[in-house]
Amino acid sequence: MPKNTPIIRSLLDTDLYKFTMLQVVLHQFPAAHGEYEFRCRNHPDTPLTQLKQQLETQLDLLCELRFSQDELDYLRGLRFIKSDYVDYLELFHLQRRFISVSEEGEQLAIRIKGPMVQAMFFEIFVLAIVNELYFRPLDSKAVREEGRRRLEAKLAELERFQREEAPGQRFPLLIADFGTRRRFSRDWQAHVVERLNHALPQVFRGTSNVYLARKLGITPIGTMAHEFFQAFQALGVRLRDFQKAALESWVQEYRGDLGIALTDVVGMDAFLADFDLYFAKLFDGLRHDSGDPYIWGEKAIAHYRKLRIDPATKMLTFSDGLSVDSALQLQRHFSPHIQVSFGIGTHFTNDMGLEPLQIVLKLVSCNGQPVAKLSDSPGKTMCSDETFLAYLRQVFKVPALA
């Protein structure tokens, strides 16, 4: 493939939650300024610095893209997307000056600095580009065949579950593709989603990728990410109240739509302390993205029961490094008590027999102030300001990791 062929060919080729979060930013804090930093959590065989020149070219191409009228009409047809927001997107394109790429020793450094209405939208595109550039030299007929073999084995296991176990389950098995950011390639994700949609129509509930959802006529899935909550640490509310402010902001924007709340920005215990009866009734359920999923799920069920809410009326969505096997184990454990669904990423879109990259591009400051996530998993916290991290831990009574 020629080096100047764009990897990203549509601004819809990203996750739905980028659109849903951006709408809140545009309507409620349009002047906010954000800074994002890239990090690779593992040690790839080929240094990512070797991708710098190709990445620069791809970013130039990305920043030439605009939404087509057909794409805007599709977005306008989603009931939670407001018409003035689509009018804004008609004028929208990513500005190249807000993103920079450099080498810091053997590390690839990517930084995004700019208005949140711009900076927020880069992340998924950049991660997908880095992945595809990295794996392109490793792509081969043998790699694709291994990927197909693994995918078909997963489909067979899911079909077996549907046939043999699902009839006895209280709630159905629901699985979605969450794999855009870590995909092997654009065309491979399309193949995976098409196969899931064709083979498992009763199980596969959609994809986070808006382009593929539109193309295949399936449901785009997503609500919010950590960056949405983190921004509220710097938006003028008392730090102790940032989660409640973020949840309230979401409620006011979506009025009952998009009702799955993310819980691990400062840990599940601190989240539940803020997730009172008001929010527990308003939101449809919770999303798990770090820590032990069984402990987390039991805490969620106990919290609903303490509030005298029947857990069977709510949903737990699991999305932390899942495989088909781990999803099925969670389904067996929780479906007698509460509705469950699963967002599977790398295990669907980059299980080719090659070690996947563990790359992230995270919000590190907002309006010039540090922001952070105190994840339920060691190693997922990302903040260079140790003083702010210590203060955040103190405010939410989160013990420091040993």
From Swiss-Prot:
Enzyme Commission designation: 6.3.4.21
Superkingdom field: Bacteria
Modified residues (Phosphohistidine): 226
One cellular component (GO) term of this entry: cytosol
Pathway it works in: Cofactor biosynthesis; NAD(+) biosynthesis; nicotinate D-ribonucleotide from nicotinate: step 1/1
One annotated GO molecular function: nicotinate phosphoribosyltransferase activity
A Pfam family assignment: NAPRTase
Key word Ligase present: yes
GO BP: NAD biosynthetic process via the salvage pathway
Phosphoprotein among keywords: yes
Family membership: Belongs to the NAPRTase family.
Role, per record: Catalyzes the synthesis of beta-nicotinate D-ribonucleotide from nicotinate and 5-phospho-D-ribose 1-phosphate at the expense of ATP.
Protein name per the record: Nicotinate phosphoribosyltransferase
Organism: Chromobacterium violaceum (strain ATCC 12472 / DSM 30191 / JCM 1249 / CCUG 213 / NBRC 12614 / NCIMB 9131 / NCTC 9757 / MK)
